[in-house]
């Protein structure tokens, strides 16, 4: 259950319309690295996260991403509020206007509609947290790109705040990922087999209820590394 407060997480007070910049910023509403995809990613992943501490982090950050989406929508709304037909045509906002008038609709800067394919939820803690860390860096890069294009301090101020929060989220997911990796038990058995004429040693884990994901991850990395070295030596 969420409690909604009738205020933005960070103030958005834009006094000058700018539909050209609105078309850029809207990407952080419905683009591939936007806040809508981020919130859906984390709030979906939390159900199959095996560790309560990390589930809490996913819930916290997923909830905050909803607040960030609200901020982005407020920015776009204030940048396009009460536009005249002349302004809409002058700044190239006509294509969006035809389909949505001045309503908010999730799309990327290029006009691509939002899609659930922008995020994954795999049910494996390392896989999901790795995606989460990458997602936060991609969002941070997108905000960097926006700040390179925008000079208005009224717009830059909330965008900088959002960028800073992406860095904090990345750090929190990194800490969670390290905590997950520390739960991998020590190896107990060593299995040997040959490939490309080389002998490989694979140590497996036992006595852990999440053994399969970690075991498969370790096996994949080990086999790819060893086979790659073997193939290189035969060329």
Across the structure, where does each feature detected by a protein language model lie?
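Non-heme di-metal
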Residues: 1-209, 214-222, 226-228, 234
